[in-house]
């Protein structure tokens, strides 16, 4: 149980932040408004995924 939770948590956090953040920064000032919208969506999606993964593990 410990190994599965650690692996999934670390992998999702690193992949999601690295890919999405890099794309927004490359576009520059034009992407400022888009960044705010994407940030809100990211939090909601992550919470839903975490709840589902915890339920399956139990």
Curated annotation (Swiss-Prot):
Region Disordered, residue ranges: 1-58
Molecular function terms from GO: DNA binding
UniProt KW keywords: Chromosome, Developmental protein, Differentiation, DNA condensation, DNA-binding, Nucleosome core, Nucleus, Spermatogenesis
Cellular localization per UniProt: Nucleus; Chromosome
GO BP: cell differentiation; chromosome condensation; spermatogenesis
GO cellular component: nucleosome; nucleus
Bilayer-spanning residue ranges: none
Tissue: Gonads.
Function field: Protamines substitute for histones in the chromatin of sperm during the haploid phase of spermatogenesis. They compact sperm DNA into a highly condensed, stable and inactive complex.
Protein name: Sperm protamine P2
Organism: Bolinus brandaris (Purple dye murex)
């Amino acid at each position: 149980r410990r190994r599965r939770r650690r692996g999934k948590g670390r992998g999702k956090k690193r992949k999601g932040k690295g890919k999405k953040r890099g794309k927004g920064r490359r576009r520059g000032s034009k992407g400022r408004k888009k960044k705010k919208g994407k940030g809100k969506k990211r939090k909601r999606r992550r919470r839903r995924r975490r709840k589902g993964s915890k339920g399956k593990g139990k």
